[in-house]
Amino acid sequence: MENCTVFWFRRDLRIDDNAGLYHALTSGNKVLPLFIFDTEIIQKLPKKDARIEMIHAALRNITDAMERNRCNVGMYLGQPRAVFESLLKKFNINKVVTNHDYEPYATARDKAVGEFLQNNGVAFETYKDHVIFEKSEVVKDNGTPYKVYTPYSRKWLKRFSEKSLSHYPSEAHLDQLATVVQPQLSLNDLGFEPSHVPQPQYTFNPTIIKEYEESRNFPALDKTSRAGAHLRFGTLSVRKLVAYSAQEENPTFLK
């Protein structure tokens, strides 16, 4: 196989408006998409974990969208460094692209994986995708971080009013996917079972946004977007949600 770029899905489980995927698909190489079920994380989870079920369903949805290009998302189980060590023996990989992950474990993992790849002549690139602003982008005037939420939120809204949201049309470049059949894993293969917990369905409802300031304190009301889990796993673009919400001019919802 000719030189290829790997796109490593993590908390960005969608093909549309995906910054890292867009940069991978426009890199000039064919792109090999994959997801690693990290044993360091999943071995601590209950057998009927709804989060794993949601991730697995999202990967199946991505594969369904990619199949017209004769491609699928590879599902791998193991420690990321070991998985990449194996992949380097099978494919001519010259670059691995992914999106930033901010959790302490993820930061350490990415540092180790990045060093391993670079020591083997493979570039490792990460992009901002999961947030509108990173921690260094919204700080006090003296450059130090905020410790109180209210002044932070004011600065965030001020910065947002001065910023135009980027859009990354990754969905328009799927013809750059590598035509390679990669392994698929079932929940059972991963050591899990169906949770029977209904997956939340998010909604873009202008009424919910407009009335959020009044309704947010009444959980019995059906007045939320249900976007939380989708933002957590990236099945919904935060830029897409924020752009839509900003049209309704309700800063409380944006907070």
Model-predicted segments: where are they?
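Glycine/tryptophan-enriched, flexible segments
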Residues: 148-255
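Trp/Phe/Arg-rich N-terminal binding region typifying the photolyase-homology
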Residues: 1-160
